[in-house]
Amino acid sequence: MYRKEFNIKKYRPLIEQIFDALELVFTHGKMADQALETVMKKNKKWTVYDRSFVAETFYEIIRNWRFLWTIIGKEPEMKRHFLWEILGTSLVLKEEKLPGVYLFKNVIPHKIEEKAEKYKKVRALRESVPDWLDKLGEKEIGKGWTSILAALNNPPKLILRTNTLKTNTEILQSKLKEEGVETVAIDFVSDALELPFNRNVFRTIPFHDGWFEVQDAASQVVAHYMDVQPGMRVVDACAGAGGKSLHIAALMKNKGKLLAMDNKEWKLKELNRRAARAGAGVIETRLIDSSKVFKRLEGSADRLLLDVPCSGTGVLRRNPDIKWKLQQEELDRLKIIQAEILDEYCIMTKVGGKMIYVTCSILPSEGEEQVAAFIKKHSEFKLLDQLRLSPDKEGYDGFYLAMIERIS
């Protein structure tokens, strides 16, 4: 049963911008979020509904990219006639009624539905992943791969983390409601709020005032897992733009010292900007420009967080273009980097202190296997605990966390 006819006249200008964004991703190699931001900045007069339509349609096409072009029966290309066919196929699968215009002349609903039923039986096609990644997932994860992959192909939830340095969850909920943003508290992790309906929260007064950050619930688990206390000396050695550093600072109640490090200066500048907005005065940033940085900090950290570069397979829901950018060679390179980071950075942990190894990957070769190899090589460390957060069980991003104590 089809819904009302798709309004091509209303949406065509928006669709052309979606196609521009897709070209940025698949031809020019831009990350999906960057491509979307590019077209959003060019169209500042768009309404909230325009922006929502563009974002949802753009990500839906990327998420189902292989399934869509397999149904069409053509190799992917960035020519407009192909993209209109892709869009039309996507609309039919959502039970939208297509208008009788030349743009959709090759889109025949009953044929699309027949092919969709056929190709849904093939997991790699149904979930739109490359064959090599599907085979790797099955090899590493086994029977659980099918349900994990299905969960990773769903749209992500929008989760906020309350900045407890400035407010609490109840007050934040109330203030957001005043601006028309409905939220619900979740049991999975404290101080987190979920938005049942997507809204542009970045234009709200609470965001401007540093009362919250957008951060997936699984990512929020990391700082809690570290068991940081006020007054500790903590090092976040792969801090990036500081999402986890800000959370750690809040749990430390701005008491002690939190050293946020990264090898990219522009990320640390962004971290400093975010820390100022959040009121996280305990954070100090430091650029990793040589291995001497680690030697100077040897044996100093009560807690050392290693949120290492990884495949990102645990966050495919919010970064679905990773499926088409990641290659086996890149994964192999990342695993070498992960092992090197463990070997080089671990010296910053003091005896009796704890190192927390984290990846947003669902692959054991980037998680459990890396930690096992490290422990075998370093007798001065002991594995205390491991935690695997799975998208098909908790309903959030996929993460691996390990708590490792330095014993000598």
Please place each PLM-identified region on the residue numbering.
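S-adenosylmethionine
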Residues: 1-408
